[in-house]
């Protein structure tokens, strides 16, 4: 833990409802300030790439803060809820990751305003949509200014090997599935012989002896 990061004491006392603040609320404000100072310190430029990085950094921090939830605990005899104390808890890493992934999938392509470099790097007003018919990105939207390289084909300039010859999963609908990984080029199917250790037994002391078994496995590879 960071010694200077204490509980968030603004959540204290009577809430005015049928519960009261108590416990130790996660200090999201401290985390926001610390993260901003630590992550943004490397962004010194004034060009579009640096403005994009600063915007996306802030979008991530705002996503974390906006997903804080109230947790409560009951106090009382025999399991009754005579008194209920509550505190604010940060979302889990999985929750944040899923939200960021959703925003990544819906990221907005932007360009710099016509008047040049932004006067305020911390706001989304630095950008305009690349497509004029699209709406202005919000503060928690992720943005980008150029398309990713084509990862389907080999590109020595970017160091991407492409997906030709990659083993894929014929039954998966995810990124490891043949439909996506092979970029609609199709795949081959072959039966290969595999030698594996099997029927392993432990012998005192201290060895494990195994037999060698042969099996056949179906392998799918991208065209």
Swiss-Prot record:
<dbReference type="Pfam" id="PF00110">
    <property type="entry name" value="wnt"/>
</dbReference>
<dbReference type="GO" id="GO:0005125">
    <property type="term" value="F:cytokine activity"/>
</dbReference>
<feature type="disulfide bond">
    <location>
        <begin position="200"/>
        <end position="210"/>
    </location>
</feature>
<keyword id="KW-0272">Extracellular matrix</keyword>
<feature type="compositionally biased region" description="Polar residues">
    <location>
        <begin position="125"/>
        <end position="135"/>
    </location>
</feature>
<feature type="disulfide bond">
    <location>
        <begin position="7"/>
        <end position="24"/>
    </location>
</feature>
<keyword id="KW-0879">Wnt signaling pathway</keyword>
<comment type="similarity">
    <text>Belongs to the Wnt family.</text>
</comment>
<dbReference type="InterPro" id="IPR043158">
    <property type="entry name" value="Wnt_C"/>
</dbReference>
<keyword id="KW-0964">Secreted</keyword>
<comment type="function">
    <text>Ligand for members of the frizzled family of seven transmembrane receptors. Probable developmental protein.</text>
</comment>
<dbReference type="GO" id="GO:0005615">
    <property type="term" value="C:extracellular space"/>
</dbReference>
<dbReference type="GO" id="GO:0005109">
    <property type="term" value="F:frizzled binding"/>
</dbReference>
<keyword id="KW-0217">Developmental protein</keyword>
<feature type="disulfide bond">
    <location>
        <begin position="72"/>
        <end position="86"/>
    </location>
</feature>
<feature type="disulfide bond">
    <location>
        <begin position="205"/>
        <end position="206"/>
    </location>
</feature>
<feature type="disulfide bond">
    <location>
        <begin position="198"/>
        <end position="213"/>
    </location>
</feature>
<dbReference type="GO" id="GO:0060070">
    <property type="term" value="P:canonical Wnt signaling pathway"/>
</dbReference>
<protein>
    <recommendedName>
        <fullName>Protein Wnt-1</fullName>
    </recommendedName>
</protein>
<dbReference type="GO" id="GO:0030182">
    <property type="term" value="P:neuron differentiation"/>
</dbReference>
<dbReference type="InterPro" id="IPR005817">
    <property type="entry name" value="Wnt"/>
</dbReference>
<keyword id="KW-1015">Disulfide bond</keyword>
<feature type="region of interest" description="Disordered">
    <location>
        <begin position="110"/>
        <end position="135"/>
    </location>
</feature>
<feature type="glycosylation site" description="N-linked (GlcNAc...) asparagine">
    <location>
        <position position="169"/>
    </location>
</feature>
<keyword id="KW-0449">Lipoprotein</keyword>
<feature type="disulfide bond">
    <location>
        <begin position="168"/>
        <end position="178"/>
    </location>
</feature>
<feature type="disulfide bond">
    <location>
        <begin position="182"/>
        <end position="222"/>
    </location>
</feature>
<keyword id="KW-0325">Glycoprotein</keyword>
<feature type="disulfide bond">
    <location>
        <begin position="152"/>
        <end position="183"/>
    </location>
</feature>
<dbReference type="GO" id="GO:0045165">
    <property type="term" value="P:cell fate commitment"/>
</dbReference>
<feature type="disulfide bond">
    <location>
        <begin position="74"/>
        <end position="81"/>
    </location>
</feature>
<dbReference type="InterPro" id="IPR018161">
    <property type="entry name" value="Wnt_CS"/>
</dbReference>
<feature type="lipid moiety-binding region" description="O-palmitoleoyl serine; by PORCN">
    <location>
        <position position="78"/>
    </location>
</feature>
């Amino acid at each position: 833990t960071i010694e200077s990061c204490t509980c968030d004491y603004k959540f204290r006392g009577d809430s005015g409802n049928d519960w009261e603040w108590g416990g130790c609320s996660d200090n999201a404000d401290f985390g926001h300030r610390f993260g901003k100072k630590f992550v943004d310190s490397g962004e010194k430029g004034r060009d579009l790439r640096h403005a994009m990085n600063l915007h996306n950094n802030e979008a991530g921090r705002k996503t974390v803060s906006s997903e804080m939830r109230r947790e409560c605990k009951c106090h009382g005899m025999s399991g009754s809820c005579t008194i209920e104390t509550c505190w604010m808890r940060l979302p889990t890493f999985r929750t944040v990751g899923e939200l960021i992934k959703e925003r990544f999938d819906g990221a907005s392509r932007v360009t710099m305003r016509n008047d040049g470099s932004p006067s305020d790097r911390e706001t989304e007003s630095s950008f305009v949509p690349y497509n004029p018919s699209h709406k202005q990105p919000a503060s928690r939207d992720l943005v980008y200014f150029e398309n990713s390289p084509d990862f389907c084909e080999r590109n020595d300039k970017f160091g991407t090997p492409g997906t030709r010859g990659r083993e894929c999963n014929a039954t998966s609908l995810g990124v490891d599935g043949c439909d996506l990984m092979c970029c609609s080029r199709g795949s081959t199917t072959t039966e290969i012989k595999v030698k594996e250790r099997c029927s392993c037994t432990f012998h005192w002391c201290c060895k494990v002896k195994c037999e060698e078994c042969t099996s056949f496995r179906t392998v799918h590879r991208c065209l």
